């Protein structure tokens, strides 16, 4: 019996040992029932993940809530502006309130209007255009990347959000009498015609410029400009009409080839960005709905200088030109247009070769030249000797009429400044500060005039002299330049102090979008533009007329 019992116990012990070895992991605890290091590590990772996942959800929720509240608050502020100070003939202390007339509703004029304390002056804005146009995104509108209504803001809405009452007159300035301080304006409304004269103490000329044709025959009547919102509408209609006309001709027909050739003249930001937008429209939208026709479409960009975008760093210019070559945009530099005909343009390449280029649509996006009003104003003042624009001093005062007329924006010929929104914006904000300071000086002079205390008069005189000495000159700070070059890429030449940074590619494209959203005047415009970009991403461009 004893041997049998011993054998049974030994067999049971061996069986228990085997089962224990099978149930344990390779790395195991010496104590049965307790988790090993690997199990502890797995549970630790799971706990950390759950903790950060919950934190991420909370952060997303609070960020979304804060963003929604901010947008709602901004929309409420824009929709419910506070009560304005009404215009009056004088201040409470008896000082006469001066008349400030602003000609134009572009970047310079609107930047001035937004920055100025309009309760200090009787402000009148005169412009044939009753809205502000966000010009940096204008090249995106003809092909439907951005809707035209998304980049406009009514002048009356902007004026209503200022501290003091602002009068707006939908009219065009015709002439100025600098000696009498009067400006002649003419209505542009078809329903009501009038010509009237407005008196001013200060006149701000911010009438912009028009696209120059360099006196090339045939540009007017054959080319489409891209300066105003009406130009973008005309280009969209012309583009759609040309594509439909081309589709009615058989493949390999010379007329079909001509109609499907789109020529853009001008290698500045406007010309480059429109050419890029047009090629995007062909590659990303028409290729889906009209695949055969889209393969025959050709975009040609013509520039008279050796390279496009000459305000950018050379490395960025090279990047843009290489991208155009990849996207099959025919870039022709050192090419000057000599004649424009209804169906073709004649060019001179490298100063040697004459070439005829047939086109279905021609977009003219070259430099600027003064409008008729600016030319009339130049003729009134002998000191205005530059035919390219109004001459101003370093305080933005018009030469020959320094104490009463200012000029800002594209209508001026300011050496070293590009005719960009950035320059006009800074000029407008600077002028608002100057006008505020001038009113403060006038208030001190009025108090000095009405004071009988010699000590007080002496103190006020010192204060006046000090404030006059602090009327700084205009100091332009170049922040850089941005340009969209197609295929969801952009270039950015940024300047911060003495340092410069060059960005390109997708990151620069996101920066380009963010920068322009930040530059918009209202939260309404920001929302509409962001919605347009989102719509294009998911649904494609809407190019319907």
Curated annotation (Swiss-Prot):
Q: Where does FAD bind?
A: 99-129
E.C. code: 1.6.5.9
Entry-linked InterPro entries: FAD/NAD-bd_sf, FAD/NAD-binding_dom, NDH-2, NDH2-like_C
Report the record's Gene Ontology biological process terms: glycolytic fermentation to ethanol
Q: Where is this protein's transit peptide?
A: 1-21
**Subcellular localization(s) per the UniProt record:** Mitochondrion intermembrane space
Q: Supply one GO molecular-function term.
A: oxidoreductase activity
Keyword terms, alphabetized:
FAD, Flavoprotein, Mitochondrion, NAD, Oxidoreductase, Transit peptide
- Residue positions annotated to bind NAD(+) are 260-296
Q: Which enzyme type, at the first EC level?
A: oxidoreductase
What positions belong to coiled-coil segments?
none
Give the protein name, as stated in the record: External NADH-ubiquinone oxidoreductase 2, mitochondrial
Species assigned in the record: Saccharomyces cerevisiae (strain ATCC 204508 / S288c) (Baker's yeast)
* Gene for this chain: NDE2
